[in-house]
Amino acid sequence: MPAIDLSTIDLRAIKPSDLDWRKFTLDTGHPMRRIFIWSVAVNMGIGQSGERLEKAAKVMSELTGRTPSYRLAHKSIKDFGIRRGEPIGLLVTLRRNEAVWFLLRALAAVDFTLREESFNAGNVSFGIREHILVPGSRYDPALGIFGFDVAVTLARPGFRVQYRRRARADVGKDHRVSREETIRFFQDVLGVRILKR
């Protein structure tokens, strides 16, 4: 049973403040073992800087409600006209209510269907070919159409120990989120259909 009844929600009009990210958890019987959405990273690889990148940045900020971070080329590729250090991509990381809000809309764009190969231990990634498929987005002929990738990371309480600055530590093997638990989270909490190989 999904955390919310998606048939009662208009994904075009929903706002992050309408959601509570704490409700989107998979209860595994112990409070420290529950699984929740840690982050949703939205990536656009444009492959060039200039006007097209600026248009993509405008589209991404409309989609996510956040200002994107510019990602730089790691090396020069003469054939593609890319120089090292040149901005060629965009990234936005969403957390909590905003992460759930965007993820529901992104999943609606792919019909709440994901391939089994998209999952690994605690993560799932999928792509959307055209941003206009996302509910609530609109087509602007001056900007064009862009595709993007969505990467979702799941976590349990206590995962902060691997990211904090002081007394950093690894998360134990038994406490990590497995691939099977990741698939179960998306099926049970978000109502996603999994396409088998």
From Swiss-Prot:
This is Large ribosomal subunit protein uL5. Part of the 50S ribosomal subunit; contacts the 5S rRNA and probably tRNA. Forms a bridge to the 30S subunit in the 70S ribosome. GO terms for biological process: translation. Belongs to the universal ribosomal protein uL5 family. It comes from the Archaea. One of its GO terms (cellular component) is ribosome. GO terms for molecular function: rRNA binding; structural constituent of ribosome; tRNA binding. It comes from Caldivirga maquilingensis (strain ATCC 700844 / DSM 13496 / JCM 10307 / IC-167). The gene is rpl5. Keywords: Ribonucleoprotein, Ribosomal protein, RNA-binding, rRNA-binding, tRNA-binding. This is one of the proteins that bind and probably mediate the attachment of the 5S RNA into the large ribosomal subunit, where it forms part of the central protuberance. In the 70S ribosome it contacts protein S13 of the 30S subunit (bridge B1b), connecting the 2 subunits; this bridge is implicated in subunit movement. May contact the P site tRNA; the 5S rRNA and some of its associated proteins might help stabilize positioning of ribosome-bound tRNAs.
